[in-house]
Curated annotation (Swiss-Prot):
Physiological role: Participates actively in the response to hyperosmotic and heat shock by preventing the aggregation of stress-denatured proteins, in association with DnaK and GrpE. It is the nucleotide exchange factor for DnaK and may function as a thermosensor. Unfolded proteins bind initially to DnaJ; upon interaction with the DnaJ-bound protein, DnaK hydrolyzes its bound ATP, resulting in the formation of a stable complex. GrpE releases ADP from DnaK; ATP binding to DnaK triggers the release of the substrate protein, thus completing the reaction cycle.
Region spans: Disordered: 1-41
Name the UniProt record assigns to this protein: Protein GrpE
PROSITE patterns the UniProt entry points to: GRPE
Lineage, uppermost ranks: Bacteria, Pseudomonadati, Pseudomonadota, Gammaproteobacteria, Enterobacterales
Gene: grpE
CDD domains found in the cross-reference section: GrpE
């Protein structure tokens, strides 16, 4: 009988016995109770939670910073737009007394006198050309009568009884008002009609 043919108890070859014993050894592992948790696993879980919280805070900070940046950019653009739009306001305010003087000169001029006709015509043309120039830059005159009083563009200085004009409407304009690109730079001084 050769060694290969040699059988161990119960007819098993020696290699089969070793493999079987090895399987038994692997099957026997120390049992870990639920109470025995590896402290490293606990620390890893804690660190992962801290990392997730830090990422969440960082994301919120970044979103807030982006929103602040967008708001600042939008405000700056609006400020620049307003600066361009209303840059002429100071200049126009300086021109208003000149325009008022030309208006008053026309009001008091004796238009019936033929000797003054060329001067009156010159004042009218000067006033017209000045108003045309300021209109090109967004200046509008507020001088309408028989319109409802608007506190945004009118300043009432007197109330007068009138049958021709409805109560609460502008009866007469004492001093013209002006707007620049829709913004009042000087309110019109007006008298307002009141009921009898």
């Amino acid at each position: 009988m050769s060694s290969k043919e040699q059988k161990t108890p119960e007819g098993q070859a020696p290699e089969e016995i070793i493999t079987e014993q090895h399987d038994d050894v692997e099957a026997v592992e120390p049992e870990v109770s639920a109470e025995q948790v590896d402290p490293r696993d606990e620390k890893i879980a804690n660190l992962e939670a801290q990392l997730a919280e830090a990422q969440k805070r960082e994301r919120e900070v970044m979103l807030r910073a982006k929103a602040d940046e967008d708001n600042l950019r939008r405000r700056t653009e609006q400020d620049i737009e307003k600066a361009h739009k209303f840059a002429l306001e100071k200049f126009v305010n300086e021109l208003l007394p000149v325009i008022d003087s030309l208006d008053r000169a026309l009001e008091v001029a004796d238009k019936a006198n033929p000797d003054l006709a060329p001067m009156v015509e010159g004042i009218e043309l000067t006033l017209k050309s000045m108003l045309d120039v300021v209109r090109k830059f967004g200046v509008e005159v507020i001088a309408d009568t028989n319109v409802p009083l608007d506190p945004n563009v009118h300043q009432a200085i007197a109330m007068v009884e009138s049958e021709d004009v409805a109560a609460g409407n502008v009866l007469a304009v004492m001093q013209k008002g002006y707007t620049l690109n829709g913004r009042t730079i000087r309110a019109a001084m007006v008298t307002v009609a009141k009921a009898k």
